[in-house]
């Protein structure tokens, strides 16, 4: 008998291009990564998006009667709509019918649904969204967390983010002794606001991580750090700025290389290099951020995600499941809870 494929539940109705692009991405992922995809959403709309596809088997459809819209207040909508697609997808993980969830819908709703249905890992005060960014060193990405789950943080939250980030970096990114940094406005321990100064002291005393000091904005993509922690307010701004810079660089390259015969010749010569560069800096390649600290694997993708981004998000979910990220965080904090 073959190995049982990883099962990924996808919120098929979440996102600006749902369900068509979500379905397309699910099919791509199922073909590319050998996973089994379960699509939670309106069966009629999902089937309509599958009509042109001949590949077999197609993802399984799990009916959901409602949708949490992007403009809705997340917690209220999640509670008021128990049969919304995001809730059905989360329930599949809770009931162990799926191993992970991917959603490009209302990110606040995804977090609220995860907390209500999957709960927090014992010992974790707040979950965090971790995003992987490329650095100037090939194949040496940096994990930033939190990038949006918690606008306001306490030092102990960032300390927990550092531990969870270290586990993820070791498990999924195959980093040996991840070097942890604290996002700040200077290198000195005394620099920054009250949160930064107090967090620095706590991280320095944490023997579960390899804390090497403050990370300034210029250090983020340098390759010096493997994990950088910050509050969700600063992290979200950092993430979106980095993605915008990546988009701008790609657009500038297209504009400079396309005009005239010389541009076409240059493009042809540089095509392999340009393709590699695009794969490194295009945020679509990373698919989404992992919600760390909840009792299940949950990937939160951009609302603007299209098929390729969804497919890559499924890949990220599969990697987190197969590298037992949840179990490793659980075991780390279970020991702490028992020793308290």
UniProtKB/Swiss-Prot annotation:
GO molecular function: phosphate:acyl-[acyl carrier protein] acyltransferase activity
Record InterPro entries: FA_synthesis, Phospholipid_synth_PlsX-like
Gene3D superfamilies registered for this protein in UniProt: Isopropylmalate Dehydrogenase
UniProt-listed GO biological process terms: fatty acid biosynthetic process; phospholipid biosynthetic process
Compartments reported by the entry: Cytoplasm
UniProt EC number: 2.3.1.274
Entry GO terms, CC: cytoplasm
Domain of life: Bacteria
Subunit note: Homodimer. Probably interacts with PlsY.
Name by which UniProt lists this protein: Phosphate acyltransferase
Organism of this sequence: Trichodesmium erythraeum (strain IMS101)
